[in-house]
């Protein structure tokens, strides 16, 4: 079952442009990941592979701040605060997951076990389920 763009915007709370930025980051990340795993670029570190995701998170945070300020100026204070809170929560959990995964791939430490690394994703999925029930 595929979701329409309207449903994705409604459930995720992101604007269409933000979804496009994250999909573009996923495409660039996939290319860099394939290059890194195949060993075609020996100087490419895991931190460089994850740069598209970090850039997309930064651009999305910047865009959300601008939209929230504009909503606040237009008198939509409640909507501005709720949107800012929701999107920053989603982006923070995504960013923590990316940082922990990248650190695990670089250092290969035993202190970072995969249950700890994926815990932000599970929290995010629970929040998305709650939001999906509230939206409908």
From Swiss-Prot:
Membrane topology: Multi-pass membrane protein
Record localization: Endoplasmic reticulum membrane; Endoplasmic reticulum-Golgi intermediate compartment; Lysosome membrane
Membrane spanning residue stretches: 14-34, 50-72, 81-101, 112-132
Record flagged with keyword Transmembrane helix: yes
Disruption phenotype: Male mutants are sterile and exhibit a profound defect in spermatogenesis and spermagiogenesis.
Record function comment: Involved in the regulation of cellular calcium homeotasis. Required for spermatogenesis. Acts as a regulator of STING-mediated inflammatory signaling in macrophages. Forms a complex with STING, promoting the activity of TBK1 kinase and the transcription factor IRF3, leading to activation of type I interferon expression.
Name of the molecule in the record: Transmembrane protein 203
The organism of origin for this protein: Mus musculus
């Amino acid at each position: 079952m595929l979701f329409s763009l309207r449903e994705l915007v409604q459930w995720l709370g992101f604007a269409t442009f933000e979804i496009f930025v994250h999909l573009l980051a996923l495409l660039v990340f996939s290319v860099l990941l394939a290059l890194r795993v195949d060993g075609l670029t020996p100087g490419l570190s895991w931190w460089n592979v994850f740069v598209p995701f970090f850039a997309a998170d930064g651009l999305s945070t910047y865009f959300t701040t601008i939209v929230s300020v504009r909503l606040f100026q237009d008198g939509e204070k409640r909507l501005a605060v709720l949107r800012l809170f929701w999107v920053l929560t989603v982006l923070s959990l995504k960013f923590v997951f990316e940082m922990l995964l990248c650190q695990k791939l670089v250092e290969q430490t035993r202190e970072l076990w995969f249950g700890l690394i994926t815990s932000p994703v599970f929290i995010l999925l629970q929040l998305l389920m709650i939001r999906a029930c509230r939206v409908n």
